[in-house]
């Protein structure tokens, strides 16, 4: 019975990941940030003319971005790597895996390793329905990096601290 429940939970996470992939695939490139990050960030913050063609372009762009706009250089480096070189399709695949992992990690954190189909379903519904601006934060290209990936890494870090941190 336990094996059957494990397989149902795994199948659920896989199904949600596939559905999330379809949503990402159907989400168009946004004309604001998604297009802007395909180019080397300009010093004047207006003339986006040089497309990202290499890692060197990304380093130059992120240096300017850091000086002109904000300090999210690590996340935006990865964003420009995908937006300029690797492409949206690979990002969609990785993001769907990360979304499934996010549901799993949140469930582990909340239920203390007693994952169940109910906890996965509840977390999924809460993410889809209660997250303000789910489309902007979890489906648009820039939002995937700024929110989904960073959120998952943060929860992974918290889980690591809980497991290996000093116990009082």
For each predicted feature, which ranges?
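Hydrophobic core of alpha-helical transmembrane segments in multi-pass integral membrane proteins
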Residues: 14-22, 100-104, 121-129
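Extracytoplasmic loop-helix module adjacent to an early transmembrane segment
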Residues: 20-67, 79-80
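Membrane-interface micro-motifs in multi-pass membrane enzymes
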Residues: 72, 119-162
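Short hydrophobic alpha-helices at membrane interfaces in multi-pass membrane enzymes
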Residues: 163-168
């Amino acid at each position: 019975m336990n094996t059957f429940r494990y397989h149902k939970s795994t199948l659920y996470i896989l199904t949600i990941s596939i559905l999330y992939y379809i949503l990402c695939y159907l989400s168009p490139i946004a004309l604001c940030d998604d297009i802007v990050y395909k180019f080397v960030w300009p010093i004047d913050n207006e003339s986006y003319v040089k497309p990202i063609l290499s890692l060197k372009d990304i380093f130059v762009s992120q240096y300017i971005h850091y000086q002109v706009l904000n300090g999210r250089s690590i996340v935006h480096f990865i964003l420009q790597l995908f937006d300029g070189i690797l492409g949206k399709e690979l990002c969609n695949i990785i993001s769907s895996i990360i979304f499934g992992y996010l549901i799993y990690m949140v469930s582990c954190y909340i239920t203390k390793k007693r994952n169940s189909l109910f906890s996965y379903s509840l977390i999924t519904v809460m993410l889809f329905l209660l997250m303000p601006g789910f489309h902007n934060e979890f489906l648009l290209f820039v939002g995937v990096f700024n929110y989904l990936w960073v959120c998952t890494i943060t929860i992974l870090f918290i889980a690591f601290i809980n497991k290996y941190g000093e116990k009082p």
